[in-house]
């Protein structure tokens, strides 16, 4: 699909060259983005979802984004709606747990959430799930560094089920927010071990620090 130059500028004109490189990459099957604090990770992910829909031949039912909290999923959906409008409502943005509950056709509960990912992995690997339930061709992962061993096994199971699946994993390899639940920074680093070839890209510019410096300079040297 082709966007007019003016529409492209409207959607993506404020992105940095590094962010645009990731947006325009439509050939790499496996992409890992190491994004430092304040580097525009959320903006990148929202715009990558938009580019998959509007610039590539990805249908909304083929696209899944997973994150680690319902609050994050809600925020991503809100920002995507602001960017591309009503089309965003058809994109699945879920937590790992809610995706597994949907996959198995079960109602979510706190008790079941402890085991639902392992159950999903077993069902996928034993081919005990109806094929029409696993239809995703593109998987986008937020905070990939926070994947624990169970979530990483789910990722591998989905990849083995569909060897053509594209994976776009974005995270900070220096930070594991959910370390208390078994997550380690090895998750994002392990992508290179399991997924070949892997295109690794970096976002290092800290917009937040840059803005703090500008704000401080404005206070010290008012116009």
Residue spans of the language-model regions?
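Loop/turn-to-beta-strand initiation segments
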Residues: 63, 136-138, 163-168
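Conserved RecA-like helicase ATPase core segment
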Residues: 152-223
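P-loop NTPase Walker
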Residues: 1-109
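Structural preference for long, well-ordered alpha-helical segments in enzyme cores
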Residues: 45-49, 72, 76-80, 120-126, ...
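Conserved catalytic network of the ASCE P-loop NTPase/AAA+ motor domain
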Residues: 55-58, 85-86, 131-133, 147, ...
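Hydrophobic residues in beta-strands of the RecA-like P-loop NTPase core, especially within AAA+ ATPase
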Residues: 141-147, 171
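Conserved SAM-binding loop
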Residues: 65, 93, 140, 169, ...
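Conserved helicase/translocase P-loop NTPase motor core
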Residues: 18-19, 25-30, 93-138, 148-157
